[in-house]
């Protein structure tokens, strides 16, 4: 039977830690029997890694792929707990710890190409071996290096229009006007926008789709140290409104959704940056009877400050809603 029964890391459940904040927790070590000369410690680790395959240059063999990758170390701190008289009796022992997160950290992130992760790991060792360890991952929200106060106070709008053909010889047009009171938000905040749709065709418009996209540009290097970049997009949020706009009519749809509580901030310049992120709200009207769509795109800026995070909505609010006017 192992001398160590269990080792646990105790932290507030589902906590989101801002860069620059303090992590307070406990390590709980439970022993089956007396342990002599133990080492009990806890580590805070944050690192990022990206990797993808791409074809090598024009003059070379396209049948071969090259691996592009990059990594960054953001934080690595260790606390070793003092052990009185260098032994621990059987039973449970609790060790308190706290770590200060560095003020400049990227947010927790995960995709098929890259990840940025943070974790606290507790370890119990004797003179030669690791007897037990436990790792607990953290949610960390990065802080913006810049503030977008002027942008956040300005309304933004975009308009799209398309001429369409239907029923062989009929023609018309559909216009879409999307307006937001601002385009700068913090994670967890509610995003509200208005879509005005004008249907100058003889057909019904049934649905309108709203989606928030994250566009990420990764930076890596080949084995020969050549710099490479890779762009990728992912859909963070999606909702659909049953507009049902009659022929030659118009309507206004007011929509809202809550942003995720942890998001990469819109890219500024930062050391050890292995990826840059931008965001876009896309409103799409599907016109299946003409095999076409009308799309409006609005850039969204994500910032994060201590003041902004204190004011944003929490999980108990509705994630999204929409209604017609």
Swiss-Prot record:
Q: Where is this chain's protein located in or outside the cell?
A: Membrane
What SUPFAM superfamilies does its record include? E set domains
Q: Tell me, what's a Pfam family for it?
A: Arrestin_N
Entry-linked InterPro entries:
Arrestin-like_C, Arrestin-like_N, Arrestin_C-like, Arrestin_domain-protein, Ig_E-set
Please state which protein family the record places this protein in: Belongs to the arrestin family.
- Briefly state the protein's biological role: Plays an essential role in spermatogenesis. May be involved in the anchoring of the sperm head to the tail during spermatogenesis by affecting SEC22A-mediated SUN5 and NDC1 transport and localization.
Q: What is this protein identified as?
A: Arrestin domain-containing protein 5
Which organism is this protein's natural source? Mus musculus
The record lists the lineage as: Eukaryota, Metazoa, Chordata, Craniata, Vertebrata
């Amino acid at each position: 039977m192992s001398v160590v029964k269990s080792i646990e890391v105790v932290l507030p459940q589902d906590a989101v830690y801002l860069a620059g904040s303090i992590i307070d927790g406990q390590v709980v070590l439970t022993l089956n029997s007396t342990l002599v000369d133990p080492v009990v410690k806890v580590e805070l680790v944050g690192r990022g890694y990206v990797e993808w395959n791409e074809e090598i240059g024009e003059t070379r063999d396209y049948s071969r792929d090259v691996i592009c990758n990059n990594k960054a170390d953001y934080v690595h701190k260790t606390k070793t707990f003092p052990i009185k008289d260098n032994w621990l009796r059987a039973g449970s022992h609790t060790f308190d710890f706290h770590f200060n997160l560095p003020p400049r950290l990227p947010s927790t992130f995960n995709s098929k190409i890259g990840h940025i992760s943070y974790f606290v790991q507790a370890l119990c060792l004797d003179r030669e071996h690791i007897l037990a360890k436990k790792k607990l991952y953290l949610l960390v929200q990065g802080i913006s290096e810049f503030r977008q106060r002027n942008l956040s106070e300005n309304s933004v709008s975009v308009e799209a229009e398309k001429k369409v053909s239907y029923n062989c010889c009929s023609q018309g047009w559909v216009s879409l006007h999307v307006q937001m009171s601002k385009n700068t938000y913090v994670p967890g905040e509610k995003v509200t926008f208005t879509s005005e749709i004008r249907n100058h065709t003889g057909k019904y418009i049934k649905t309108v789709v709203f989606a928030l996209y994250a566009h990420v540009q990764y930076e890596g290097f080949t084995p020969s140290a050549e710099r490479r970049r890779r762009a990728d997009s992912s859909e963070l949020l999606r909702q659909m409104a049953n507009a049902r706009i009659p022929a030659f009519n118009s309507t206004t749809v007011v929509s809202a959704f809550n942003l995720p509580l942890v998001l990469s901030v819109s890219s500024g310049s930062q050391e050890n940056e292995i990826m840059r992120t931008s965001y876009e709200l896309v409103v799409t009207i599907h016109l299946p009877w003409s095999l076409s769509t009308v799309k409006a795109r609005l850039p969204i800026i994500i910032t994060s400050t201590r003041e902004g995070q204190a004011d944003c909505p929490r999980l108990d609010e509705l994630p999204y809603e929409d209604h017609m006017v």
